[in-house]
Amino acid sequence: FVQGMFEYDITSKLSTKVNLKYAFDYTRYVNNDDKLIHVDNIYKQREGYISWANKYSILSNWDVSVAYDYQWNGLSEYTSVFRNTHWISAATAFSIKNCLKVQVAALATIVDEEARERENAPNKKKVTPAIFLSYKPIRKADFIIRAFYKHSYRMPTFNDLYYTDMGNAYLRPETAKQYNLGFLYDIDRKGHTFSFFRIGADIYYNRVKDKIVAYPKGQQFRWTMLNLGEVDIRGIDAQTMAIFRLPYKIELTTKLQYTYQEAIDITNPADNYYRDQIPYIPWHSGSAIAMLSWKGWNLNYSFIYVGYRYNQQENIRYNYTQPWYTSDVSLIKTFKIKRTHLKASVEVNNLLSQDYDVILNYPMPKRNYRFGISVEL
């Protein structure tokens, strides 16, 4: 892919920004199993994107913005599908005495889709509002209470709609009403060994209509896509971070994250799985990360844990899926040659070479290695 950005301050109060992007993806699926129908499908997906955003400062503490985004997607070879998506947004943000910040926004989404070999997915139009609040009750302390309400709208992707023989061109968009309340507290102690500490937590509630989910059909690459009529989601996210300045200019950063989530299907009280946890969503998950930094070198360790869950809609013993956890290690070196920035990395994933399935009957690789080099001009 290739992308670019242009930003310009027209006046001291008015600024504009333009983003451009073009991407191309090539996927080939071949099935030579003589017991099944021979399959050799090629998918070529192209994406063009342009965004134009403008911001005007009415006062030093009051901004308004208007933006237009356009995205073109094309899928060809095995099937020919084209989608034009337009987003028009307007937002305003203001602060009161540097302790209360408010942002209000509205987003209009317009989708026009054409499929040449099969029925078109219906065109869509939707307007979704959002409001974000941030309050700092103590001026001298970095303690923030935050809350938001957001109405979101998610279109099915081409993968959801067309990539499989069982694709559903009439898969409905997913809509959600999201409520969130949380806090963030920072302690900055420059010059000390224990130089920074952060703790935060959020409680949230989402009511999702036509939630898009995928079930593996037993053959890799192929999934059954469907909508769950109504899903009730509530949970807690908590995280901490600490930074230590050690001798010899070594910096140690540690992060802990924990999530509790209940996501239950409340579509129809007559269903056997009514108020059961939806497939592959664990109640408990978390991660721990440690990073050592020294003179452009970074040594990272991460531990990820995902609790038990169910692989089908009914929460019965037969559908129980065990928890899994894994450890990864990476070593990264960044350096600069004149104006060119380079980064070299070595990763060891699944360090303990454990057997685990994220999706039932789809075993993940044992210990594996990855090497990478990136160049930024």
Please identify what each model-predicted range represents.
Residues D9-S15, S57-N61, K97-K101, P137-F143, ...:
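Short loop/turn motifs that connect adjacent beta-strands in outer-membrane beta-barrel proteins
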Residues Y22-R28, Y70-S76, A106-E114, Y149-M155, ...:
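Transmembrane beta-strands of outer-membrane beta-barrel pores
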Residues R28-I37, L75-R83, E114-P122, T157-T164, ...:
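Outer-membrane beta-barrel translocator domains and adjoining extracellular loop/strand segments
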Residues I37, N61-K140:
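Signature of Gram-negative outer-membrane beta-barrel scaffolds
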Residues N98-L100, F196-R207, N227-Q313, H341-K343, ...:
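Gram-negative outer-membrane beta-barrel transporters
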Residues K136-I138, I144-F148, R154, E174-R234, ...:
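Membrane-embedded beta-barrel scaffold of Gram-negative outer-membrane proteins
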Residues K209, Y305-Q312, D328-L377:
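C-terminal beta-signal and adjacent terminal beta-strands/loops
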